[in-house]
A protein has these predicted regions:
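Primarily membrane-embedded glycan-assembly and transfer machineries that use lipid-linked glycans
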Residues: 1-66, 92-215, 220-228, 233, ...
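Membrane-interface alpha helices of multi-pass inner-membrane proteins
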Residues: 64-77, 82-88, 220-227
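Juxtamembrane membrane-interface segments at transmembrane alpha-helix termini
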Residues: 3, 57-62, 82-83, 108-117, ...
Length: 328
């Protein structure tokens, strides 16, 4: 469905070779994450499906329904929270209203079963025992099972263990910093991601829809795992849309920019370095602890941004040539 929305065509009307090559490669690139998701039986595909439903309605100019679907996805898991930043940057007020409405429903719905007071107690307990008891810099989620920037900061700037191999705990500490400074670094990284989303939305707001809308959506999806404070392999099914996007741009030769292609290739290579099938358990864990996977995700986001610059520049030149043509 996402590919059909992105191209503005029915799936059956897309040339057979194109649709199968794009979807096969994108699915192959994310197969590791999908299999892990199915193995652990998590809700990440449901979250992804709700976001895609929201995007379907958004493409149909149904703003309120878009917000409600997106809001319910965030109510299940906060993974999709960066889309709030995206819609804020696009000034989609009705969508934001729908998100708030869905969030309110999700918070109050359990009250119809357990009562309002107990419902509030549950939410307070969750906030105190889960959110406040595990702050950035605590090192409690520093293992390589957590691929977020928050965990990377803990691994590099605290003495927390990075991974265990044959009963021995390994660390990759660069320098030990006070917990408060580590927390500041994590917050700054999240602000940097939010800023990047805003910059993309504002810079390319007048670009062709493939760039302004679908490129932006792919950009947000690619940064979602890094924005979250806890990101595990099953959560990475959300990378399917950005991989569909970059494979489509590459295969259909929408841009032949070498930098874009190098970034996509590096993204795949760095994420593959963390696979124990190729490098064994120890090396895969060590490379993950060093941040290879996080760098790979940043490369993917950079590739999408680079493609937007190249395609938008080419489109502006084409339009400029058309305007100047009749006068010469």
């Amino acid at each position: 469905m996402f590919y059909s929305l992105m191209t503005g065509q029915r799936f059956s009307s897309i040339p057979a070779k194109t649709r199968w090559v794009v979807l096969f490669l994108a699915t192959a690139l994310t197969a590791r994450f999908t299999l892990a998701h199915l193995r652990f039986g998590q809700t990440n595909i449901l979250v992804l499906a709700l976001v895609v439903l929201a995007l379907t309605w958004f493409s149909q100019r149904k703003a309120l329904q878009t917000g409600i679907a997106a809001g319910f996805s965030m109510s299940i898991k906060l993974t999709a929270l960066p889309f709030v930043i995206w819609f804020l940057a696009r000034r989609s007020n009705k969508v934001l209203l729908g998100i708030c409405l869905a969030g309110l429903i999700a918070i109050l719905l359990p009250a119809s079963i357990v009562g309002l007071r107990r419902n509030l107690d549950y939410h307070r307990e969750w906030f105190e025992r889960v959110v406040m008891s595990d702050p950035q810099g605590s090192g409690s989620w520093s293992g390589t099972g957590n691929l977020s920037l928050r965990a990377q900061a803990d691994r590099f700037f605290s003495t927390a263990g990075a991974f265990d191999y044959k009963g021995k705990l390994y660390r990759v500490t660069i320098i030990e910093l006070p917990k408060k400074i580590v927390r500041v670094l994590v917050i700054l990284s999240m602000l940097a991601i939010a800023t990047a989303i805003i910059v993309y939305a504002r810079r390319f707001r007048d670009a062709p829809e493939l760039i302004s809308l679908w490129g932006g959506i792919a950009f947000v999806f690619s940064l979602m795992p890094l924005f979250s404070t806890v990101t595990e392999i099953p959560h990475l099914v959300v990378l399917l849309p950005p991989y569909i996007y970059v494979v489509h741009v590459w295969y259909c030769q929408i841009t032949a920019d070498r930098t874009f292609r190098a970034l996509v290739t590096l993204s795949f290579v760095l994420s593959s370095l963390t696979t124990k099938v190729f490098f064994g358990v120890f090396l895969s864990r060590l490379l993950t602890a060093w941040g290879c996977f996080s760098i790979g995700l940043l490369m993917l986001a950079a590739a999408i941004f680079r493609a937007a610059i190249c395609i938008d520049t080419a489109e502006r030149r084409r339009l400029s040539a058309q305007r100047e043509g009749p006068l010469t």
